[in-house]
Amino acid sequence: MLRRKTVKEYINEALEKYIEKGTYPWHMPGHKRRPLEKSDGSMCLKDDENGGQSPQNVDNISKSRENFWNGVYAHDFTEAKDLDDMHEPEMFIADSLAEMKKVYGTFATYMLVNGSTSGLMTAIHATCHRGDVILAARNCHKAVYNAICMLELEPEYIVPDYVDMRWHCGANQSMSDRMTDARGKDDCETQEGTDIRGEGDRETPERTDILGDISPDKLERAINTMIADGRKPSAVIITSPTYEGVISDIRIIAEIAHRYGIYLIVDEAQGAHLNFMEGYETAMEQGADIVIESLHKTMPALTQTSLLHVMDPKLDERVRRYLQIFQTSSPSYIFMQSMEKAVAFGANNRAVFVEYGRRLEIFAEKCDNLRNIRLFRPGVNVSKNDEGCSACKVFDHDEGRLVFVVRPGTVDGSGQIFTGAMLADILADRYGLIVEMASVSYVICISSVVDSVDSYDILFKR
C-alpha cells in the first residue's frame, strides 16, 4: 500500500490562522482564550497601558502559544503510582472534590470531563428507571432527549411562553444608527400611529422569540394532570438559566416537585458563575436534587469541563454508578486541573466578580437608550414576575448574558428586514466581534469575568 510521507495539520493550521485574525470572542469558553495569571503568578485580569484584554490585542495569545504544547504534555498524567483516579478518588482528587463540596454547599460534587452532556445523562438515569414518566421543559438540551430515548421514558413537556419586550425612542445611536424602521421614517411611531415619545417616555410592547421562565403554576397543573392520568413523573428537569439567561423560580418549583415526591434536576450549565456573583442564588441553594453546571461556558475553564452537584444523599450511589458509564475511563488530568483552578479562582477572588457585576451594570445602562436594537433587560424593558404582572414570563435574568434584540420591522439601508443573523455578520465581518448565537430577531453574547472595560466599550461603540 502506498502511504503518504507527509501529513498536513489542517486543524492546527486553521486555528493558527484564526488566532491571527485578532477576533474577539463574545462566546464560550469563559476564559476567552486568555490566561488568568502572568508568569510571575500575578493576575492579568485588568486593563493596563499595553491593552491588557483589548479585543484586538493578540500579543499575549501569540506569546503563550509558543510554549503551549510543552505545557500541555508536561501536565498530562494518568492513573499511575502516587497519582489519583477520578472515578475512585482517594488522594488529592478526593481532597479537591471535598473542597468543591464546601464551596457549593452540596452533599457531593463531581467533575465531568465529558461535559454537561454526561451530567444530564447521569442525572436522568439516576432518577428514572426504564419506561418511567418524566416531565421536561420543552427547551431542554438535546442530551435530555437522548436520555429519554435510551431509557424509553414517557416524556411530558412544559412549554415556556414567549416574552414581550418594551420599546422606546432613544438618543444614542451606537449599534443601531445604520438601520431605520420599516413602519416609517420616525421609528418612535408605533403601528397604530401613537407617538411613544414625550411625557413618561411611553413604550410599546413587542413579542420576541425569546422563551420565558418555567411557570410554577403551569408546572403544578401539569403534575396534577399527569397523576390523575396515572402517569406520575419520576423526575422534573428544567433549564435555568436558559441560553438567553432567563432564570426560573427554582425554590418554588422544588417545593412543588418534592410535595409530590418527584426529583428535580436543574440544567444550570449556563450559570456556573452565579455561585460567585452577588444577588443570585444557585439551584443547589434553592432545593434542586441534582444540578449540572458547565464551567467552560462562563468560568475560566477549558471546553468540555463541567460539574455535577448532588443535594439528595439517596441519589449519590446511582449518580456515581452512572458517572462511570457516561464518562471516559481515561479522564484528562488537564481537564481536572482546569476545573479545580476555575473553582478556586471563583472562590478566592470574589472582588473580581463584584467588579464584573459593576461592569455589566454600566454597560447595560449605556444600552438603555439604543434605538432599533435593545439589550434584553428584565426589570427594565421586560416585565418581571415580581412587578405584579400576571402575563410576565421572567422570574429573573443573568445580567452576564447579553442578548441584543432587533426591533420588529427594522430594515437596513437597502430596505431589507434586519435580522439577528445580519447583526451577527456585521459584528464579525466589520469589527471582528464574534457572537455566541444568532436567532431570527436577536444575538447572544456571552460575557465572563475575563472581559475588560475596553471589551464592553468596543462592543457598544460598534
Predicted regions span which residues?
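N-terminal glycine-rich, Lys/His-bearing helix-loop that initiates the first secondary-structure elements
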Residues: 1-70
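Conserved PLP-enzyme active-site core in the AAT-like
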Residues: 2, 7, 14, 103-106, ...
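Short hydrophobic transmembrane-like helices used for membrane targeting/insertion
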Residues: 43, 58-61, 175, 179, ...
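Conserved N-terminal alpha-helix of the aminotransferase class I/II PLP-enzyme fold
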Residues: 47, 73-115
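Low-complexity, intrinsically disordered or signal/transmembrane-proximal segments
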Residues: 53-56, 173, 191
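Short glycine-rich or small-residue beta-strand-to-loop segments that form or flank ligand, phosphate
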Residues: 110-112, 236-239, 444-448
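Long, intrinsically disordered low-complexity tandem-repeat segments
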Residues: 180-208
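Conserved C-terminal alpha-helix-loop-beta "cap" of PLP-dependent enzymes
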Residues: 362-462
